[in-house]
Amino acid sequence: MKKNARRMTQAVALLVWGACLAGCLRPSGQEMQLTLQLTPEGMAAETALAEARKTIAERLEEAGFRNPVVETVGRDRLAVRIAGVEDPARVRRLIRANAVFELRFVRSPALESEEAVLAHFKGQLPPDLEILPEEVRGENGQAVETKYYAVEKRPVITGRDLRTARPGVGPFNDPIVAFEVKPEATATFAEATGANIGSRLAIVLDGRVVSAPTINARISDSGIIEGGFTREQAQDLAIMLRSGPLPARLTVVDERIGGQSGG
């Protein structure tokens, strides 16, 4: 009787183990496949394609996707295949965001429209300024309001001046991104911020203001980015800043998720 019970227990254990091999070890989510069209801007297509491939692979691997496949197709396309995708929108952001990072001085108040910014300058925007939007985000990371600033066209530093970036938590337990500046850029950063204490410094990503904090003291080698992020958004921004900007514009020409296609 005891032997039969033991055998039954072993049989059940084998069934559970077999089911786990079939399901537990399989990555959750679906497979996602994308074909990307590359449009080089000021760079040879072959070089841009190689750099884009490397950058996208780095972003996906750092985001936790196991063994993503990024391959060149012809002279101007990339084929991307990722397993275990639970949030396709996140994959699109990681792949398509140029991640062009700049710090620029703000030269107007935050206003409700581009027209209001122009009115602030009596209808004539100075040639060294441009108007950029800021999406103010709520607790869930979604945009709840848009404001506009006049900011200097010339950046103080760019993403190429960053040594590293990492997600963190701010003084009020809100997600942030902390960054460090390369040694060769610290003197420029310190001089510019030291001469503009009391002014606002716009943190610009892909032509949009993420936040525009006031400079309270001279800054030389580090800073933080606050923008009403979720933890995942802060993590992804840090990943994109570390990987650097894409060398060319990418357009999704085909997308398949779990066997379903969408152009």
Question: Where are the regions a protein language model picked out?
Answer:
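Extended, hydrophilic extramembrane loops/domains of integral membrane proteins
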Residues: 222-255
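Alpha-helical membrane-interface segments at transmembrane helix boundaries
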Residues: 84, 238, 254-263
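A structural signal for short, hydrophobic beta-strand segments that form beta-sheets
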Residues: 3, 162, 252-256
